[in-house]
Regions:
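Conserved donor-nucleotide/metal-binding helix-loop-beta segment in metal-dependent transferases, i.e.
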Residues: 211-242, 246
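Active-site-proximal specificity loops/subdomain of glycosyltransferases
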Residues: 133-199
Length: 430
């Protein structure tokens, strides 16, 4: 009985269809394992690993570089230390408000990563403004440190009337971040307007920027203002940070909305191809019998097609360059505004007075028909998983650039140098 069963099994395994399934099964296991290793950072992948995805990798290196950079410029003596400041005619004004945090403080790493590795031409084109947004700025651990005066173009606390200052103190005491956050954002925008810079970059004090962020951003802005791809006066901001949590398969995607059709097409195409091969190459008929074709079309092709969907949309179709992001954009970690759009935006924020700043900007863009853009891949990471606004950690974890940590430092450095050396980029740095 056992011998008969074994012979039947061996006979079955000797069939072409069984051999195809065995080989395909082995290939599928290899592909599945590769996907587990390669796509575990995509939050909408079947291989997402939430246990390890928030560990710093590239951000940790940049934090060390940033802190080393600021520590060099924090020496007690001025001897041997050159101030690294911008000019009075910047191409970009970068501004951030910083407050004392109860736990982790990333302000120094934010400023350091913003400035370290900048070419002198890049630094001269950038005006950096820092607002200490505690009504008592001496509470902040970085207030008064020497590196600020040597690296930052404008360091300030509130320069407002007594009445406004008392109101800010009340907001601070009441933890009214919805109103004070909007006030600070408007304050920064107005500060940058005074510099005359054509672009205004507002970022938060708990981010880490990648090597080469400035030249890549200016290159993207050049595309938006020159040539056949110009979008003058039609966009409100260029986003340097976005999170992949918003970039999932949705009903807007044709092949996701029509997934049954996708499976039928690949299965039908595979079947047609195999039948065509069997018809024109008689030598294949013994192998390509009906059972083999059925195994390929009904098992193998659907399995590998399903694996593609399981990878996640962003893993399969990563963004590159300047792209529209009108729907899935999130948060205000790093937005670059064209100067001409800022006065009207300031007026709207002052009118609304309080709320979630990012939602208010999105609402304004919807009402005015202005396009929201993003520079891909992300140029900064939001490392402040503990919010300064009493937000839940589970909410701040969703504000994470998952693939940012896969950046290769050597590759980014080489790319930065290549972009600086390219003759067609001299326009933005001379």
């Amino acid at each position: 009985m056992r011998v008969s069963s074994l012979q039947s099994l061996l006979h079955l395994l000797s069939q072409p269809a069984a051999k195809v399934l065995l080989v395909a099964g082995f290939a599928y296991l290899l592909a599945f394992q590769y996907c587990r290793i390669r796509f575990w950072r995509d939050p909408h992948s079947a291989f997402f690993d939430i246990r390890n995805v928030f560990e710093w990798k590239y951000s940790l290196l940049r934090e060390h570089q940033a802190q080393h950079f600021t520590s060099i410029h924090n020496a007690p003596s001025d001897s041997g230390i050159d101030d690294q400041l911008g000019t009075d005619r910047p191409l970009m004004c970068a501004a951030l408000a910083t407050v004392k945090r109860d736990k982790d403080d990333y302000f120094e790493a934010t400023v350091g990563s913003l400035l370290t590795d900048l070419d002198p031409r890049e630094r001269h084109a950038l005006h950096l403004s820092v607002l200490f947004a505690n009504t008592d700025p001496s509470q902040h651990p970085s207030w008064g440190q020497k590196w600020l005066g040597r690296l930052v173009d404008s360091v300030s606390s509130y320069n407002v009337s007594e009445e406004q200052f008392r109101h800010l103190q009340e907001l601070e005491e009441q933890h009214n971040f919805y109103e004070k956050g909007v006030y600070d954002y408007v304050y920064l925008l107005n500060q940058c307007l005074e510099t005359g810079a054509p672009y205004i970059f507002i970022l938060e004090d708990d981010v880490i920027l990648a090597d080469g962020w400035f030249v890549k951003t200016m290159n993207g802005l050049h595309q938006l203002s020159h040539g056949s791809t110009a979008r003058n006066n039609t966009w409100i901001y260029l986003r340097l940070f976005y999170t992949e949590t918003s970039l999932m398969w949705s009903s807007d995607d044709f092949w996701y909305r029509n997934m049954p059709l996708a499976f039928l097409l690949v299965m039908g195409s595979g079947c047609a191809l195999l039948l065509l091969i069997r018809r024109h190459w008689p030598g294949t008929r013994a192998s390509l019998n009906n059972w083999t074709i059925a195994a390929v079309c009904l098992v193998v092709i659907p399995a590998f097609t399903g694996l593609l969907y399981m990878m996640g949309k962003y893993s399969l179709l990563p963004l590159e360059g300047v792209v529209e992001m009108n729907g899935p954009g999130c948060c205000t970690q790093g937005l670059v505004f064209p100067r001409e759009q800022v006065p009207a935006l300031v007026a709207r924020l002052e009118e609304k007075k309080a709320g979630q700043t990012d939602s208010m900007i999105e609402e304004y863009a919807d009402q005015t028909g202005l396009t929201r853009l993003a520079l891909a891949p992300q140029q900064l990471q939001h490392v402040g998983l503990r919010s300064s606004r009493d937000n839940l950690e589970i909410n701040t974890q969703s504000t994470w650039a998952f693939w940012f940590e896969e950046n290769d430092a050597r590759q980014l450095k080489a790319e930065h140098e290549r972009l600086l050396a390219a003759s067609d980029h001299y326009w933005l740095l001379d």
